[in-house]
Amino acid sequence: MVAKQKKLSLEEKSREILGILTMVVGFFVLLSLVSHEPTEELSIMPGVHFHNWMGYIGIFISYVLFKMFIGWASLVIAVLIVVWGYTIFAEKDIQPVFRFTGYSFSLSLIGITLFGLIAGQSGMPNDEVFRHAGYLTLNITKLLKDFLGFPGSIMVLGATLIVLVQA
């Protein structure tokens, strides 16, 4: 006997397609970040060999997320895109994913900012901190250090981390 197959409505098909596409984008971003090469810039010149597995689009994604945004903590963004894609595809409850997204992104931002503060304080050159933590993080750490000093910045970030974990 052949089991009857349930016909999917257009809305269900659209949701599944959106979920799959979101997961594909998440994996694309993840592979772009994993294969990030710090020396690759956003120029497309003939004859230049690129190292990013995802080509020129991967270079652009890794440039924006690594160099301009939050460095290695950008990997969390790629994972969150995949999680959102799965949630959409599997028609799971969105509320826990919102909470997970907020916690994950906040923890990664606080963590990379702590890294930037400690690395800068320990004498690591700004270009090295920039290479690992990104431009946004470098500016956040500079702002915190200018207004609060190193100990004050550590205290504020530590308190924020404790409040975040306790919530």
Locations of the language-model features?
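Alpha-helical transmembrane segments used as membrane anchors
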Residues: 1-167
